[in-house]
Amino acid sequence: MVQNKTTGSCPKPTEVAPGGPSWCKTSNGHIKRPMNAFMVWSQIERRKLMSLCPNMHNADISRSLGQRWKLLQDTDKIPYVREAERLRLKHMADYPNYKYRPRRRSRTQESKTRARLPRSTATCQSVPSPCLSQMDTGSSMQWGETCPAWGGDQVGQSVETQIRESSARSPEVPTHTKTVPSSPQSAEEHEGLEGGSLVIPVDKEVPPHSGSHFEFPDHCTPEVMEMISGSGLLESVPDLVFSY
Protein backbone atom coordinates (compact mmCIF):
# COMPACT_ATOMS: atom_id res chain seq x y z
CA MET A 1 0.00 0.00 0.00
CA VAL A 2 2.90 2.34 0.69
CA GLN A 3 4.37 1.73 -2.75
CA ASN A 4 1.09 2.41 -4.54
CA LYS A 5 0.56 5.63 -2.65
CA THR A 6 4.08 6.74 -3.36
CA THR A 7 4.02 6.12 -7.10
CA GLY A 8 0.48 7.37 -7.56
CA SER A 9 0.74 10.60 -5.59
CA CYS A 10 4.25 11.64 -6.69
CA PRO A 11 4.54 14.25 -9.42
CA LYS A 12 6.40 13.52 -12.59
CA PRO A 13 10.21 13.52 -12.34
CA THR A 14 10.42 16.11 -15.14
CA GLU A 15 8.92 18.69 -12.80
CA VAL A 16 11.89 18.51 -10.44
CA ALA A 17 14.62 20.32 -12.38
CA PRO A 18 14.00 24.06 -12.67
CA GLY A 19 15.03 26.04 -15.71
CA GLY A 20 17.55 28.85 -16.08
CA PRO A 21 21.35 28.93 -16.48
CA SER A 22 22.05 28.98 -12.71
CA TRP A 23 19.72 26.14 -11.78
CA CYS A 24 22.54 24.18 -10.04
CA LYS A 25 24.33 27.11 -8.35
CA THR A 26 23.99 28.41 -4.82
CA SER A 27 23.87 32.07 -3.79
CA ASN A 28 27.58 31.90 -2.96
CA GLY A 29 28.44 30.71 -6.46
CA HIS A 30 29.08 27.09 -5.44
CA ILE A 31 28.12 24.54 -8.09
CA LYS A 32 26.21 21.62 -6.67
CA ARG A 33 26.50 18.04 -7.79
CA PRO A 34 23.83 16.62 -10.09
CA MET A 35 21.14 14.70 -8.26
CA ASN A 36 20.92 10.93 -8.44
CA ALA A 37 17.70 8.90 -8.58
CA PHE A 38 17.21 8.82 -4.82
CA MET A 39 17.76 12.58 -4.51
CA VAL A 40 15.20 13.24 -7.23
CA TRP A 41 12.63 11.03 -5.51
CA SER A 42 13.40 12.24 -1.97
CA GLN A 43 13.10 15.91 -2.99
CA ILE A 44 9.50 15.32 -4.02
CA GLU A 45 8.63 13.11 -1.06
CA ARG A 46 10.30 15.39 1.48
CA ARG A 47 8.13 18.33 0.51
CA LYS A 48 5.06 16.17 0.75
CA LEU A 49 6.06 14.75 4.16
CA MET A 50 6.92 18.19 5.57
CA SER A 51 3.52 19.51 4.54
CA LEU A 52 1.80 16.65 6.32
CA CYS A 53 4.03 16.67 9.45
CA PRO A 54 5.56 20.15 9.91
CA ASN A 55 6.86 19.34 13.42
CA MET A 56 8.78 16.26 12.32
CA HIS A 57 12.55 16.40 12.81
CA ASN A 58 14.79 16.50 9.74
CA ALA A 59 16.71 13.38 10.82
CA ASP A 60 13.46 11.43 11.23
CA ILE A 61 12.32 12.55 7.79
CA SER A 62 15.57 11.39 6.18
CA ARG A 63 15.38 8.05 7.99
CA SER A 64 11.80 7.50 6.87
CA LEU A 65 12.62 8.41 3.27
CA GLY A 66 15.54 5.98 3.20
CA GLN A 67 13.38 3.12 4.45
CA ARG A 68 10.65 3.87 1.92
CA TRP A 69 13.16 4.05 -0.95
CA LYS A 70 14.42 0.57 -0.09
CA LEU A 71 10.86 -0.76 -0.20
CA LEU A 72 10.30 0.52 -3.73
CA GLN A 73 10.55 -1.96 -6.58
CA ASP A 74 12.99 -1.51 -9.44
CA THR A 75 10.16 -0.83 -11.89
CA ASP A 76 8.99 2.08 -9.73
CA LYS A 77 12.51 3.56 -9.65
CA ILE A 78 12.93 3.65 -13.44
CA PRO A 79 11.37 7.13 -13.98
CA TYR A 80 13.61 8.67 -11.33
CA VAL A 81 16.69 6.97 -12.78
CA ARG A 82 15.90 8.48 -16.19
CA GLU A 83 15.37 11.91 -14.69
CA ALA A 84 18.70 11.68 -12.84
CA GLU A 85 20.47 10.80 -16.11
CA ARG A 86 18.86 13.77 -17.85
CA LEU A 87 20.02 16.08 -15.06
CA ARG A 88 23.55 14.69 -15.29
CA LEU A 89 23.77 15.41 -19.02
CA LYS A 90 22.35 18.88 -18.50
CA HIS A 91 24.87 19.53 -15.72
CA MET A 92 27.74 18.47 -18.00
CA ALA A 93 26.50 20.77 -20.76
CA ASP A 94 26.07 23.79 -18.47
CA TYR A 95 29.28 23.27 -16.44
CA PRO A 96 31.83 21.44 -18.62
CA ASN A 97 34.79 22.31 -16.36
CA TYR A 98 33.12 21.11 -13.19
CA LYS A 99 35.08 18.79 -10.92
CA TYR A 100 33.71 17.37 -7.74
CA ARG A 101 35.70 18.62 -4.76
CA PRO A 102 34.40 17.48 -1.39
CA ARG A 103 34.36 20.09 1.31
CA ARG A 104 37.16 19.86 3.80
CA ARG A 105 36.46 19.99 7.46
CA SER A 106 37.23 23.36 9.02
CA ARG A 107 39.82 23.66 11.76
CA THR A 108 37.33 25.18 14.19
CA GLN A 109 35.19 22.05 14.04
CA GLU A 110 38.25 19.83 14.58
CA SER A 111 39.31 21.85 17.61
CA LYS A 112 35.81 21.58 19.07
CA THR A 113 35.76 17.81 18.65
CA ARG A 114 39.20 17.50 20.21
CA ALA A 115 38.13 19.62 23.17
CA ARG A 116 35.18 17.31 23.79
CA LEU A 117 37.34 14.20 23.98
CA PRO A 118 37.98 12.94 27.57
CA ARG A 119 41.50 13.36 28.83
CA SER A 120 41.75 10.04 30.66
CA THR A 121 45.31 9.33 29.52
CA ALA A 122 46.70 12.54 31.03
CA THR A 123 44.98 11.82 34.34
CA CYS A 124 46.39 8.32 34.52
CA GLN A 125 49.92 9.52 33.85
CA SER A 126 49.78 12.37 36.37
CA VAL A 127 48.48 10.26 39.27
CA PRO A 128 50.97 7.54 40.26
CA SER A 129 49.77 4.26 41.67
CA PRO A 130 50.33 3.93 45.44
CA CYS A 131 50.90 0.18 45.13
CA LEU A 132 53.71 0.61 42.60
CA SER A 133 55.41 3.37 44.58
CA GLN A 134 55.24 1.26 47.74
CA MET A 135 56.71 -1.76 45.97
CA ASP A 136 59.52 0.32 44.47
CA THR A 137 60.39 1.89 47.85
CA GLY A 138 60.37 -1.46 49.65
CA SER A 139 62.55 -3.17 47.07
CA SER A 140 65.10 -0.34 47.02
CA MET A 141 65.35 -0.32 50.82
CA GLN A 142 65.77 -4.08 50.93
CA TRP A 143 68.54 -4.05 48.33
CA GLY A 144 70.19 -1.09 50.03
CA GLU A 145 70.27 -2.83 53.40
CA THR A 146 71.47 -6.22 52.20
CA CYS A 147 73.77 -5.17 49.37
CA PRO A 148 75.27 -1.64 49.49
CA ALA A 149 76.57 -1.92 45.94
CA TRP A 150 73.01 -2.19 44.63
CA GLY A 151 71.54 0.29 47.08
CA GLY A 152 73.91 3.15 46.23
CA ASP A 153 76.87 4.93 47.85
CA GLN A 154 74.85 6.71 50.51
CA VAL A 155 73.36 3.50 51.85
CA GLY A 156 76.77 1.81 51.84
CA GLN A 157 78.33 4.69 53.77
CA SER A 158 75.58 4.62 56.37
CA VAL A 159 76.05 0.87 56.88
CA GLU A 160 79.83 1.29 57.27
CA THR A 161 79.29 4.10 59.77
CA GLN A 162 76.96 1.91 61.85
CA ILE A 163 79.50 -0.93 61.85
CA ARG A 164 82.29 1.37 63.02
CA GLU A 165 80.16 2.84 65.78
CA SER A 166 79.11 -0.60 66.98
CA SER A 167 82.72 -1.82 66.99
CA ALA A 168 83.86 1.28 68.94
CA ARG A 169 81.28 0.64 71.64
CA SER A 170 81.32 -2.30 74.02
CA PRO A 171 79.90 -5.35 72.24
CA GLU A 172 76.47 -6.38 73.36
CA VAL A 173 75.10 -9.89 73.14
CA PRO A 174 71.56 -10.11 71.65
CA THR A 175 68.72 -10.33 74.15
CA HIS A 176 67.63 -13.81 73.13
CA THR A 177 71.20 -15.21 73.60
CA LYS A 178 72.43 -13.06 76.51
CA THR A 179 73.04 -15.27 79.58
CA VAL A 180 74.77 -14.80 82.90
CA PRO A 181 77.86 -17.00 83.33
CA SER A 182 77.32 -19.59 86.06
CA SER A 183 80.87 -21.03 86.30
CA PRO A 184 84.43 -19.67 86.03
CA GLN A 185 84.96 -21.53 82.79
CA SER A 186 81.87 -19.96 81.25
CA ALA A 187 82.99 -16.54 82.57
CA GLU A 188 86.37 -16.93 80.83
CA GLU A 189 84.57 -18.05 77.71
CA HIS A 190 82.33 -15.00 77.90
CA GLU A 191 85.38 -12.71 78.29
CA GLY A 192 87.03 -14.35 75.29
CA LEU A 193 83.94 -13.67 73.23
CA GLU A 194 84.00 -10.01 74.25
CA GLY A 195 87.56 -9.68 72.93
CA GLY A 196 86.44 -10.21 69.29
CA SER A 197 83.78 -7.89 67.89
CA LEU A 198 82.72 -10.25 65.10
CA VAL A 199 82.29 -13.43 67.17
CA ILE A 200 78.68 -14.35 68.02
CA PRO A 201 77.46 -17.45 69.87
CA VAL A 202 75.42 -19.98 67.98
CA ASP A 203 71.74 -20.24 68.76
CA LYS A 204 71.36 -24.00 69.14
CA GLU A 205 67.58 -23.85 69.40
CA VAL A 206 67.28 -22.75 65.77
CA PRO A 207 67.34 -25.64 63.25
CA PRO A 208 70.43 -25.77 61.01
CA HIS A 209 68.52 -25.11 57.78
CA SER A 210 66.28 -22.29 59.06
CA GLY A 211 68.03 -19.66 56.92
CA SER A 212 69.05 -17.33 59.78
CA HIS A 213 72.58 -18.77 60.33
CA PHE A 214 75.41 -19.90 58.10
CA GLU A 215 77.22 -23.19 58.54
CA PHE A 216 81.03 -23.17 58.46
CA PRO A 217 83.52 -26.06 58.64
CA ASP A 218 85.31 -26.84 61.94
CA HIS A 219 88.52 -25.01 61.15
CA CYS A 220 89.74 -21.43 61.47
CA THR A 221 92.70 -19.25 60.52
CA PRO A 222 96.09 -19.45 62.31
CA GLU A 223 95.59 -15.97 63.78
CA VAL A 224 92.37 -17.05 65.44
CA MET A 225 94.03 -20.23 66.73
CA GLU A 226 96.78 -18.17 68.36
CA MET A 227 94.19 -15.90 69.94
CA ILE A 228 92.18 -18.79 71.34
CA SER A 229 95.15 -20.90 72.52
CA GLY A 230 96.03 -18.38 75.25
CA SER A 231 92.53 -18.41 76.77
CA GLY A 232 92.13 -22.20 76.93
CA LEU A 233 89.10 -22.21 74.64
CA LEU A 234 90.45 -24.69 72.09
CA GLU A 235 87.83 -27.27 73.07
CA SER A 236 84.96 -24.92 72.30
CA VAL A 237 86.12 -24.04 68.78
CA PRO A 238 83.41 -26.13 67.01
CA ASP A 239 80.73 -24.27 68.98
CA LEU A 240 81.81 -20.89 67.64
CA VAL A 241 80.54 -19.28 64.48
CA PHE A 242 82.57 -16.60 62.74
CA SER A 243 80.74 -14.02 60.66
CA TYR A 244 82.75 -12.08 58.12
UniProtKB/Swiss-Prot annotation:
Single GO biological process annotation from the record: negative regulation of transcription by RNA polymerase II
Listed Polar residues bias regions: 120-137, 176-186
Summary of the tissues where the protein is detected: Expressed at a low level in embryos, and in the adult lung, ovary, skeletal muscle, testis, brain and heart.
Annotation: DNA-binding region: 31-99
Organismal lineage: Eukaryota, Metazoa, Chordata, Craniata, Vertebrata
GO cellular component assignments: nucleus
Function, in words: Transcription factor that binds to the sequence 5'-AACAAT-3'. Acts as a transcriptional activator.
Key words of the record: DNA-binding, Nucleus, Transcription, Transcription regulation
Record localization: Nucleus
PROSITE patterns according to UniProt: HMG_BOX_2 (PS50118)
Matches recorded under SUPFAM superfamilies: HMG-box (SSF47095)
InterPro entries per the UniProt record, alphabetical: HMG_box_dom, HMG_box_dom_sf, SOX-12/11/4, SRY-related_HMG-box_TF-like
Pfam families: HMG_box
GO molecular function: DNA-binding transcription activator activity, RNA polymerase II-specific; DNA-binding transcription factor activity; RNA polymerase II cis-regulatory region sequence-specific DNA binding; sequence-specific DNA binding
Start and end residues of each stretch annotated as Disordered: 1-22, 101-137, 152-193
Name of the protein in question: Transcription factor Sox-12
